[in-house]
């Protein structure tokens, strides 16, 4: 159950906005109440009902929409320097409240982190930006007579990064596996702005499996920026 009485850190929202506007375009930083209200809900049935009733328990203080990895790095530095909670969010199709800013703070909208996918036929993998919509990637592959063979119910309403963050499954998962099987590896940015890559290499018997460490962590440890997935003919 979500705790609605979590104590928030002390910071001045105006100062945070000013700092963020030095990192991203001013229009990418939003504090208008009606927009914040939209970001205080996802597809969780309780949240959907509260939205209809005009109840906004989990309104963030600011929403920022980066368009590059460089901007994400700058945003996370602002958040760390000012002790502002950060909630990474894709398209908000979660049905259990994962993308709600329960401590207020900042929502990091990753839906605009999208670039042309990179296909490797030799490896039968595709690398895509975390903000890319699942159905867009599948359509892009279909034009090349390829498929992910990964079909969560929210395919058209969720992002690639969201799949990793929530350890998603879907139709055909009984045959081809969940995202833990479909994702070969991914790129991440830690809260201290360290960039790391996990997976994407041949099987090894030395050291821990860092890929498993980040699957399903819902942004607690890092922000996902790119995901490499298996493709099939």
Where are these regions (language model features)?
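Residues at alpha-helix termini
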Residues: 22-23, 81, 143, 217
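Extended, hydrophobic alpha-helical segments in both membrane/secreted and soluble proteins
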Residues: 86, 95-97, 137
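Short, glycine-/polar-rich solvent-exposed loops and beta-turns at beta-strand/coil boundaries
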Residues: 90-91, 153
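N-terminal flexible segment immediately upstream of the FAD-binding catalytic core
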Residues: 1-77, 93-124
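A generic structural signal for well-ordered alpha-helical segments
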Residues: 79, 86-88, 141
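Acidic/histidine-enriched ion/cofactor-binding microenvironments in catalytic or ligand-binding pockets
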Residues: 77-78, 180
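Residue-level detector of anion-binding/catalytic polar loops
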Residues: 84-85, 147
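FAD-binding subdomain of flavoenzyme oxidoreductases
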Residues: 115-233
């Amino acid at each position: 159950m979500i705790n609605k009485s979590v104590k928030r850190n002390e910071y001045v929202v105006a100062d945070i906005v000013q700092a963020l506007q030095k990192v991203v375009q001013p229009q990418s930083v939003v504090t208008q109440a009606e927009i914040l209200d939209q970001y205080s809900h996802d597809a969780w049935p309780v949240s959907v009902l509260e939205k209809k009733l005009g109840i906004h328990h989990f309104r963030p203080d600011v929403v920022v929409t980066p368009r590059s990895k460089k901007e994400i790095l700058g945003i996370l530095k602002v958040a760390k320097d000012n002790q502002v909670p950060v909630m990474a969010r894709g398209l908000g199709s979660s049905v259990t409240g994962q993308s709600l800013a329960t401590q207020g703070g900042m929502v990091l909208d990753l839906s605009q982190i999208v670039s042309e996918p990179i296909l490797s036929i030799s490896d039968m993998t595709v690398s895509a930006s975390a903000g890319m919509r699942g159905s867009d990637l599948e359509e892009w592959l279909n034009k090349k007579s390829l498929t992910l063979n990964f079909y969560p119910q929210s395919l058209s309403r969720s992002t690639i990064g969201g799949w990793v963050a929530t350890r998603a499954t879907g139709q055909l998962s009984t045959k081809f596996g969940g995202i833990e099987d479909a994702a070969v590896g991914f790129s991440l940015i830690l809260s201290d702005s360290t960039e790391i890559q996990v997976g994407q290499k041949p099987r090894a018997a030395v050291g821990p499996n860092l890929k498993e460490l980040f699957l399903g962590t819902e942004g607690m440890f890092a922000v996902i920026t790119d995901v490499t997935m298996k493709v099939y003919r």
